[in-house]
Amino acid sequence: MSAGKLPVDWKTVELGELIKLSTGKLDANAADNDGQYPFFTCAESVSQINSWAFDTSAVLLAGNGSFSIKKYTGKFNAYQRTYVIEPILIKTEFLYWLLRGNIKKITENGRGSTIPYIRKGDITDISVALPSPSEQTLIAEKLDTLLAQVESTKARLEQIPQILKRFRQAVLTFAMNGELTKEWRSQNNNPAFFPAEKNSLKQFRNKELPSIPNNWSWMRFDQVADIASKLKSPLDYPNTIHLAPNHIESWTGKASGYQTILEDGVTSAKHEFYTGQIIYSKIRPYLCKVTIATFDGMCSADMYPINSKIDTHFLFRWMLTNTFTDWASNAESRTVLPKINQKDLSEIPVPTPPLPEQHEIVRRVEQLFAYADTIEKQVNNALARVNNLTQSILAKAFRGELTAQWRAENPDLISGENSAAALLEKIKAERAASGGKKASRKKS
């Protein structure tokens, strides 16, 4: 990240010249939840342990996985793949940000296909920028302040998708209990879709069903839809699109990532489905995986193609609600089901308004969801900019751009004995005096 023209008083050195590098010696399972010392592994969170091997100020770099970076001062212990990086005569806070700013360079040659990992040379051999001690302190302080603001902004932005998820469920709740179209209904008198009182449900699983408008009816699922099982051999349809549960995003109704039968290499029997049908995953119904097909294809036998007798989009939206998903997930007991069979699905109640009101509900829901989708897209774009901002600020810091004015105002703090060149000589002397030994270890 320090590539490009640096301030004339800065030095370019290999990181290994500025640090003592070692690793922990323990397995990750050495952690003790009641331990009194921090135990740094390759996980994002810090564990605890009852013994310590280091008593120093250091930066901890996970040697595999997410390559997380932390800093700590005091007694601690470390996992055998965690790198303990101790600064030699430079500020620990500065070293922390230096590693954050160069982590891409450190990990770009990461080895391992399943879990990437790095070696010591990936750390020690990279070139980094070295400013004077005073400027190191200032850079670390500026980065602490600026990136704390960035992280705060990022945290607030990351909360918005969950808020929007709750908003969508609230919209569906109001849609399916009649509140969303209450005023519309007062101005549009429509007869019930199923006028026969004997066909309307009053209870479900020995409990009274929620209240709905007078001209609505609670109907069994099999009264408003048919499950269209049509198993066929996929070998006869190699170029047909194959839809599986993993292609449907939970709670959104969005499908993506699907391929052809041939590309997926499937051989077992599949259901044939058609454009406009509802496709519902019966596996782990609590995941709420349902979509409306926008193409003809074949789907997993673990999915139900459904023909709706009412407005398809209305039934689809009902199947995305918390209420439907709770009923589908628990059947006759409180035990979460691994799958829902046709009998249990057929018995689930569906609140059924007159057809014109179904259309109006669908229109309003889609309008509100489109509004939420627009906000979510804006949030995702903002998050991308925030993530880029972090890297941009780090790049500016290690090109000397954040402290340019300070250098102009404080030439005495970057020259002579206070210079980066003088510091580098002191570091070399310190390394020579210690004989290049690694960090001292103690055990308690």
Curated annotation (Swiss-Prot):
Please give the InterPro entries that the UniProt record associates with this protein.
Answer: Restrct_endonuc_typeI_TRD, Restrct_endonuc_typeI_TRD_sf, Type-I_RE_S_subunit
Record keywords, A-Z:
DNA-binding, Restriction system
Short name of one Pfam family: Methylase_S
GO molecular function term, any single one: DNA binding
Source taxon at top rank? Bacteria
Biological process according to GO = DNA restriction-modification system
Q: Which family is this protein grouped under? A: Belongs to the type-I restriction system S methylase family.
- Domain annotation text? Contains two DNA recognition domains, each specifying recognition of one of the two defined components of the target sequence.
- What protein am I looking at? Type I restriction enzyme EcoDI specificity subunit
Q: Which species does this protein come from?
A: Escherichia coli
What gene does this protein come from? Answer: hsdS
